[in-house]
């Protein structure tokens, strides 16, 4: 059943009207000649607003990783930061940089870790720890609603040193 809409007369034509809040919280009027048409316009507009809000709230993996590296620069030595930066850019941003933080799943991360698993065990382990740290920080900052790395383990990846 359609909601009850108000009516407005404009230039001798009867229109149905509703108001919705846009992404900035400002009321926007939507007009249509029939209640069905107005309902369709309203649902489409609300969908677009929801989509815009979602994209505004969740940055891309690349954007958030750069921000995370900047935040880490306060806590770690310069050599550690250089190591983090190299691994984040090579193994995280290169694989998932264009995806939004809220859209990343455990499967995406595990697929991104496949090339890393061919590297040494220590590189694999540190990249997994970086993934976990970055997504934990995003969760704590309320950038994402759930942490996809919660079940990710450092076990089983990488080539042991004596086998190389």
Annotate each PLM feature:
Residues 107, 151-157:
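Short linear capping/connector segments at secondary-structure termini
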Residues 2-8, 101, 149-152:
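Short clusters of hydrophobic/aromatic residues that line enzyme substrate/ligand-binding pockets
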Residues 158-164:
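Short, intrinsically disordered, charge-balanced linker/junction segments flanking boundaries
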Residues 44, 48, 98, 155-158:
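A short linear boundary/processing microfeature
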Residues 1-59, 63-71, 83-86, 111, ...:
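Basic/aromatic DNA-contact patch characteristic of tyrosine site-specific recombinases
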Residues 27-31, 35, 57, 69-143, ...:
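N-terminal core-binding DNA-recognition domain of tyrosine site-specific recombinases/integrases
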